[in-house]
Amino acid sequence: MMRLSVQDGYFIHPVSGKADVSIEGVITDSGTLSRNYYGSNNKLECWSLDSQYPHPDVPDASQQSVRCIDCPQNVRQSGYKPCKFFTTINVVPDKTNMVCEIRIGGASLFAKAVNKMSLFKYIDYLKRNGESIDTVLTEIYLVHEAVPKMYFKPSRPLAEDEMQTVTRLVE
């Protein structure tokens, strides 16, 4: 699967290399809330794919705690938590026939901005309006703040043929 990366505040298209501050696409999988902790040498030491318990592959010497909620790296230190939330979503960019991964950091999952929606706020918004995330063309855009964030907003509902195309691509 192709990875749609973010570099210097721009999405980088995985094929063309074109940089853009926003993309439109269909989110086909909203991901699983996960966590990771990078130690003092910036090496990944501990991680969780369910945000509850360290992954079984984490070496005992690197494991920070038996449960994520009890972990000392889950305590706010100087304005941030060393153990970071993230998720990886799957997106079919508009006018393409490919599925891409986008990694979304905690600031873009839980942001409390006015008139902007983090991923979780966006999913709740769609549910309240009788839609699901995979039936709407979504604009994902970057905002350059002290901590850069991704925000989400609906562009339009998908037509039936578009939904069928997306379903074929993800199967």
Please state what every model-predicted region is.
Residues 156-171:
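Short peripheral tails and domain-boundary helices/loops at the edges of structured domains
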Residues 1-98, 147-149, 155:
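OB-fold ssDNA-binding interfaces and closely related basic DNA-contact patches used
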Residues 82-160:
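Extended serine/threonine-enriched, polar tracts that run as long, contiguous segments within proteins
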